[in-house]
Amino acid sequence: MHKFLPIAYFEDKFVPFEDAKISVATHALHYGTAAFGGLRGIPDPEDPGTILLFRLDRHGDRLSKSAKFLHYDISAEKIKEVIVDFVKKNQPDKSFYIRPLVYSSGLGIAPRLHNLEKDFLVYGLEMGDYLAADGVSCRISSWYRQEDRSFPLRGKISAAYITSALAKTEAVESGFDEAILMNSQGKVCEATGMNVFMVRNGQIVTPGNEQDILEGITRDSILTIAADLGIPTCQRPIDKSELMIADEVFLSGTAAKITPVKRIENFTLGGDRPITEKLRSVLTAVTENREPKYQDWVFKIPLNG
């Protein structure tokens, strides 16, 4: 059972979470005309009175750009300002997740984006590990990732996640933890809410942006960290069979962080994951503000400031 943070931002004001309610006729509820983001926050291990948010600037910028697909102009600065105030009002004392959402708040039944009211909301919940930290099993989904020519995949659009929901439930009902989706060319694309990486012969490989993936912020962070560590990286198409015989496979995302993959279909991957574990160790240190080189990725919010 989720434990939601007590205060939400809704209709331009902060209200008790229980009071943030929409009409049954809300356009986004019927047509998926919404876009969302997701950030993790933790109390600073060295100063519990300070909250650390990972890559707030990038998350604000991505949601602002996603909103443009909905014909909604909201600045990244506005998004960041509200999120900072949201954290201060909630005074979290455990690891938590923030969900900002822009959506068509007008009432109606015609699929459109013009002449339609929009709104911006934020809520949050306590969150530990989203997926099992010791690794997950993955099914290759029978559902395919959408194509950018028919869906704005550069935005984090809510409607796109019906495919993720279908793939996730299919995987769980088949006895797996997670699903990996192919794109329309039959190449590895992403998991249900995470980017996919593999390691072969000491090189990190991940599908490039042209493979219809979400341009993940954690993904980008991992590629930067790997390069700084001197680990070779490559962005290119990945075949399904190649993934199954990889030395290491892991998933990345704001909620999932870095999660190892133990098994794909009936192919068990090796238990030694030196590169995955090294990246996970460094990324954890970065999010806890213990890596001076990446301190500009961590936004500090003093709760009593």
Curated annotation (Swiss-Prot):
Kindly state which reaction or reactions the protein catalyses: L-leucine + 2-oxoglutarate = 4-methyl-2-oxopentanoate + L-glutamate; L-isoleucine + 2-oxoglutarate = (S)-3-methyl-2-oxopentanoate + L-glutamate; L-valine + 2-oxoglutarate = 3-methyl-2-oxobutanoate + L-glutamate
> One MF term in GO for this entry?
L-isoleucine-2-oxoglutarate transaminase activity
Recorded hits in Pfam families, A to Z, give: Aminotran_4
- Known pathway: Amino-acid biosynthesis; L-isoleucine biosynthesis; L-isoleucine from 2-oxobutanoate: step 4/4; Amino-acid biosynthesis; L-leucine biosynthesis; L-leucine from 3-methyl-2-oxobutanoate: step 4/4; Amino-acid biosynthesis; L-valine biosynthesis; L-valine from pyruvate: step 4/4
Q: Does the keyword Transferase apply?
A: yes
Essential cofactor(s) = pyridoxal 5'-phosphate
Q: What Enzyme Commission number does this protein have?
A: 2.6.1.42
Q: Which GO terms describe its biological process?
A: carboxylic acid metabolic process; isoleucine biosynthetic process; L-leucine biosynthetic process; L-valine biosynthetic process
UniProt function note: Acts on leucine, isoleucine and valine.
Looking up NCBIfam families in the UniProt record yields: ilvE_I, PRK06606.1
Task: Provide the protein name.
Answer: Probable branched-chain-amino-acid aminotransferase
Organism for this UniProt entry: Synechocystis sp. (strain ATCC 27184 / PCC 6803 / Kazusa)
Starting at the broadest rank, the lineage of the source organism is: Bacteria, Bacillati, Cyanobacteriota, Cyanophyceae, Synechococcales
Q: Which gene encodes it?
A: ilvE
